[in-house]
């Protein structure tokens, strides 16, 4: 079939965007989140599983500072530092203590305030202002850094090693942290 190109412009001047396997989310300058694309797992966060060809507002009035997308889930940090996730949760990647998929933003449980958040295919990690990394979700390859590869985590766990990071990056099944000295730990 024919492909459709969606151009998200006014009233959606985005300050940042993130893409998962088949969905994209953007944040406006005032922190409003909009998502579009495939929504079979609720990754758009609009309370449905209907796919959308145009951006739809999500969050019920929540304002976000940053947003990230995994394969079939989305996570964001609210302007007050709280982590929210939605979409597929088969491996605990939403961090709410369950494996229940969520159609709207749901608070990550047991997490400190984060300044940034990143998502791999089926796992998520957050970084605190002090540089501590926390991860949750799929751990088949040890991507959570908790010393227990193969054990999924339904809530955030601190990455081992007592290292302080300035940024985190995720791939499908791995996570890396960058220290202030420029050393990468994966």
Which residues make up each language-model segment?
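Conserved core positions of repeat-based scaffolds
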Residues: 23-26, 35, 73-76, 85, ...
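Short coil/turn segments that connect the beta-strands within blades of beta-propeller domains
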Residues: 22, 31, 71-72, 81, ...
């Amino acid at each position: 079939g024919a492909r459709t190109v969606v151009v998200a412009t006014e009233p959606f001047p985005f300050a940042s965007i993130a893409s998962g396997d088949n969905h994209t989310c953007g944040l406006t300058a005032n922190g409003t989140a909009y998502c579009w694309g495939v929504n079979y797992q609720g990754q758009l966060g609009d309370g449905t599983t209907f796919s959308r060809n145009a951006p739809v507002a999500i969050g019920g009035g929540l304002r976000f500072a940053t947003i990230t997308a995994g394969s079939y889930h989305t996570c964001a940090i609210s302007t007050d530092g709280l982590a929210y996730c939605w979409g597929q949760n088969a491996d605990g990647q939403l961090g709410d203590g369950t494996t229940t998929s969520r159609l709207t933003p749901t608070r990550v449980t047991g997490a400190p305030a984060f300044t940034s958040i990143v998502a791999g295919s089926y796992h998520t990690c957050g970084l605190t202002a002090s540089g501590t990394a926390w991860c949750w979700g799929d751990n088949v390859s040890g991507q959570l850094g908790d010393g227990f590869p193969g054990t999924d985590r339904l809530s955030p766990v601190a990455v081992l090693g007592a290292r302080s990071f300035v940024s985190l990056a995720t791939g499908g099944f791995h996570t890396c942290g960058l220290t202030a000295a420029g050393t990468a730990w994966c």
